[in-house]
Amino acid sequence: FDAEFIYATHLLEQAEREGARVINRPAALRNHPEKLAIMEWPRFIGPTLVTREAEAVRRFHAEHGEIILKPLDGMGGMGIFRVGPDGLNLGSIIETLNHHGATTLMVQKFLPEIAAGDKRVLIIDGEPAPFVLARIPQGSEIRGNLAAGGKGVAQPITDTDRATARAIGQALSARGLLLIGLGIIGTRV
């Protein structure tokens, strides 16, 4: 929980009432946490689990074989782990990320398309920009984040990515989120 973020959004609301132009509505920012907001669009995401329960993570791993585990409050690729079909070190990773059940984490089926990059789509008032920034993992990394050493490459947006970004972007624009970035791996958000 980031109390400073909450305070900042309340201060931005006050600034807005006093006449300042605020691009993204502060309440909308509070109500759409980055990683959880995607759960509203299951048709655009790969298999995903949000839980505190270690046993639920183990069942998800057994079902999907190769998974990604990440903290809900992480950024820049920090705290992201890949676990292969053998489950090597899964217990330790779960303990590290969820502090023995105290912290909720996200688990997703591994998408091998990450090798081609995690595409960042810029959406302005519901409309995606014509180009994306593909953040491509380097070396033995699975993280494409620039902060984790990924290489950024501009690419034209695909028709599929445009349709996905437009569907999500228009819904979020109606809620006051006018400037957003959407991450897409392969065809999945």
Predicted regions and their residues:
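Phosphate-binding site of ATP-dependent enzymes
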Residues: 54-55, 62-66, 73-168, 172
